[in-house]
UniProtKB/Swiss-Prot annotation:
NCBIfam families: rplP_bact
Gene3D superfamilies with a match to the protein in the record: Ribosomal protein L10e/L16
Source species taxonomy: Bacteria, Pseudomonadati, Pseudomonadota, Gammaproteobacteria, Methylococcales
HAMAP family: Ribosomal_uL16
Positions in coiled-coil regions: none
Source organism of the structure: Methylococcus capsulatus (strain ATCC 33009 / NCIMB 11132 / Bath)
Name of this protein: Large ribosomal subunit protein uL16
Length: 137
């Protein structure tokens, strides 16, 4: 599963996820992309589940790029523990997703195969997505 090798601080504030993605919003590496249209948090497990789905559907053909990385720790207190006595321990890692963020890219397969693979992967993700093609400049 994806998570940082080391961090400066173990825990982070929750923060607010506002605005739209400017950087990382275009298809940069492959021919086709899966772009988020709503905001949310994607866990490392969800990223891996969607990656496996894409990989299995294209029968390990083509090349996949994961354009998001879970770099934010989410802490949680154990069940039935009273409030206070500090922040809980880190439970999992998430990637903050803004509308317009490119999540995955794919090349080396046909467009209909890529569309179907991304449709199946989108079912594993908590954000709404759209299929995106590379625009030649």
């Amino acid at each position: 599963m994806l998570q940082p090798k080391r961090t400066k601080y173990r825990k982070q504030h929750k923060g607010r996820n506002t605005g739209v993605a400017i950087a990382g919003s275009k298809v940069s590496f492959g021919e086709y992309g899966l772009k988020a249209t709503t905001r949310g948090r994607i866990t490392a497990r969800q990223i891996e589940a969607a990656r496996r789905t894409i990989s299995r559907h294209v029968k390990r053909g083509g090349k996949i790029w994961i354009r998001v990385f879970p770099d934010k720790p989410v802490s949680k207190k154990p069940l039935e523990v009273r409030m206070g006595s500090g922040k809980g321990s880190v439970e999992f890692w998430v990637a903050e997703i803004k509308p317009g963020t490119m999540l995955y890219e794919l090349e080396g397969v046909s467009e209909e195969l890529a569309r179907e693979a991304f449709r199946l992967a989108a079912a594993k993700l908590p954000v709404q997505t759209t299929f995106s093609l590379r625009t030649v400049m």
